[in-house]
């Protein structure tokens, strides 16, 4: 699709890559043709190929989830649901794991690659339940995965006693937090990400200085502050 857009003569492309390495040849082709490449939500492996990158502070998103978990539980066995071909996922997992490792009472007992998709997260969670894996915490790199995990746990009568954390601040996840089913989510601000990306494109068009990389802040949503957020949309 990127090659097609470039061949059609577009002058700029906003990209949220599913695989931050496999995207490189298409990006290199675009740069050869003079196309501005703006990355949103997640990064490219070689950041020098991007004209601009606008992302959430993904490492801090993982840190916030881990810190909140540590404030709520004295110990735990953790399953991580990740998407290792995206930089955003890797940063979230790294932030979470780095923070958890500071406490010797928590153990990561499994890491599942669910490609960031609910329909993959749910059967993976079911497989772990069937295997009898001992865990009481699940950290998912996005709320879609967390929702798949919770659906599987509900089907197996295991929702009680399992702490589920995610990243996004999606409306469905906020509803689950309000109902005390989900523990917490690190909220992203997609409107702010999009606005920053468009602003930088205008800077490119008008010859003004462009910020090479912008990190948008994230905030934890939990039972303590859920009433400050709407469950009917994004923040």
Q: Residue locations for each model-derived region?
A:
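Secondary-structure junction motif
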Residues: 81-82, 86-94
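Hydrophobic alpha-helical
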Residues: 2-7, 12-31, 96, 110, ...
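Loop/turn elements at helix/coil->beta-strand transitions in domains of secreted/extracellular proteins
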Residues: 8-12, 32-37, 50, 74-77, ...
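Short beta-strand elements in bilobed, periplasmic/extracellular small-molecule ligand-binding domains
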Residues: 77-82, 97-119
């Amino acid at each position: 699709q990127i090659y097609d857009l470039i061949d059609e003569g577009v002058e700029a492309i906003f990209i949220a890559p599913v695989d931050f390495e496999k995207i490189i040849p298409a990006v290199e082709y675009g740069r050869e043709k003079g196309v501005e490449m703006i990355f949103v939500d997640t990064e490219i492996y070689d950041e020098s190929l991007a004209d601009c990158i606008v992302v959430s502070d993904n490492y801090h998103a993982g840190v916030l989830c881990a810190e909140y978990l540590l404030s709520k539980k004295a110990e735990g066995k953790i399953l991580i649901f990740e998407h290792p071909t995206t930089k955003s996922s890797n940063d979230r997992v790294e932030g979470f794991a780095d923070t958890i490792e500071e406490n010797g009472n928590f153990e990561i007992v499994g890491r599942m690659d669910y490609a960031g998709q609910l329909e993959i997260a749910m059967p993976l969670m079911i497989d772990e339940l069937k295997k009898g894996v001992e865990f009481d915490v699940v950290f998912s790199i996005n709320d879609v995965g967390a929702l798949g995990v919770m659906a599987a746990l509900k089907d197996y009568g295991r929702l009680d006693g399992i702490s589920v954390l995610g990243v996004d601040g999606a409306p469905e996840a906020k509803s689950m937090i309000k109902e005390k089913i989900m523990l917490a989510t690190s909220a992203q601000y997609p409107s702010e990400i999009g606005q920053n990306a468009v602003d930088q494109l205008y800077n490119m068009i008008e010859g003004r200085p462009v910020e090479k990389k912008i990190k948008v802040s994230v905030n934890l949503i939990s039972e303590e502050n859920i009433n400050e957020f709407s469950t009917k949309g994004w923040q």
